[in-house]
Structure formats: structure tokens, C-alpha cells
Amino acid sequence: LAELVLREDKDGWTVLTLNRPEKLNSLTVSLFKELRQHIIDLRDDDAVRCVVLRGAGKCFSAGHDLGDIAEGEDVPSAGWHSETLRLMEKLPKPVIAAVHGHCYTGALEVALAADFIVAADTARFGDTHAKWALTPVWGMSQRLPRRVGIATAKRLMFTADMIDANEAVRIGLAEYAVPLDQFDAEIEGLVARIIANSPFSNAANKQLLEATDMRPMDAGLQWEVMETAGIGPDMAERIAAFTKK
């Protein structure tokens, strides 16, 4: 059987590819099981300093497989999908969702669990839960308003509107958009800039930002000082290399 999530290790980073292109990478329990195992494997893999999540073929993912829903999925436990995405969100390294083509509903919930989204100009985003008389259980109600604001989240959820890459950038859902023919090169360049920096700092800063998100300013400032991860083991080497230039 074909792998439903491919792992490709590069020089200091890894690409995870949703791999059901004949089904527009629609999301099943089996696919999520493979994604979850990759996430667990990556958590303690110090050779990997950045992770890119993308889709094979025409799109990132058309969303949760409606056939699976209709047949009654055999989910390992209540909240298991959400827990899987939380594991990805808490990986101690940057995670980028590289989105081209469709990114709807469950797929958008997956992309929102990355640290940020970069879009190809072909990307289309939407939340269609309301179209199918469903409500989100993979994190949409929490991550979407944190990303775009509660009013915009309500508009997208109430209307089930599809938005293009430019609109996604305008509302803050995606960081920026690039032409599809430049997409791979852009992602590689972005990753290169990330992994050139200290993996210690990237992990510590990710944890700091998450721990203090939505805290009152004074509480956040206190946390930054009192809970600091301190100085990384590569600090002296990095400063010495810079001063020798």
C-alpha cells in the first residue's frame, strides 16, 4: 500500500506530504495515524530543524473525507484528531504549512496547526462545516479567530465562503503568497533562512510565544524574564564565527 504521508528528509529539514492525490489528499483516520507517527518521530529528532507540511498533486487537501464521516470513522479516542494536531503544534521546531490549491475545512484546521501558512497563488481556503451541518472538533474554533480575529472567523464560518490566496494574506490567514511556479524555490529559501539560525532559539522562542499568547502584558513580560530558556549551547560558537568575518 502507498504511504498516505510521505517523509522526505533534506539537509536539516523535513517535508511531510499528504499523499492521496487521487482523492485530493482528503483526510482519513489512516492518514492521520501516519501523520501522528511522523510527528512523534520528529519531536526528538535533533537533525531536523524545520518541518514543511504540504500536499501531493493538485492541492494541499480538500479536507476531511466525507465518505469516512458518513460511514462512521473508527477513531482511536474522543478528540484524537485534535490531539494529533496539538502534538504537531507543539513540535519544538518551526512547522510551515505550504498550501497550494484546495485547503478546505479539516485541511484548514491542519494548516492552522502549523506555525504559519505560506500560500501559492493557486491556494483557496474555506470552512464548510456549516454546509454539511457539522461543527469543528479539530481546532477551527480556537485557531481561526486567533489568526484572523473573531469577526472574520465568524464571517468565514457562517458563510462557508471560499477565499483566494490574496484575501487569505489580507486577513492574516496566510503570511504571503507567491506564484505557483516559484513556490518550491520560495519554500526552500524560507527554510534555509530559518535553519541558519539557532535551533535552540527557534525552539525556545516558539515555546515562549505560545506560553504568553493572550496573556496580559505584565504577566507575559514576567514570564519572559522568569521562565527564560537562557543562553543556547551554540551561542559562543555563533558569535565567534560572526566576529571572525
Locate each region found by the language model.
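Crotonase-fold acyl-CoA enzyme core
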Residues: R86-F200
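Terminal peptide-recognition signature
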Residues: L16, R20, L35, L53, ...
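A general structural signal for well-ordered alpha-helical segments in protein cores
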Residues: D11, L66, H81, S141, ...
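C-terminal alpha-helix plus adjacent terminal tail
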Residues: L1-D11, A160-N166, D181, A185, ...
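Glycine- (often His-adjacent) and acidic-residue-rich active-site loop
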Residues: I40, G55-K90, C103, A133, ...
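Conserved CoA-thioester-binding segment of acyl-CoA-metabolizing enzymes
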Residues: L1-A56
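Charged catalytic carboxylate motif
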Residues: S30, E34, W80, L87, ...
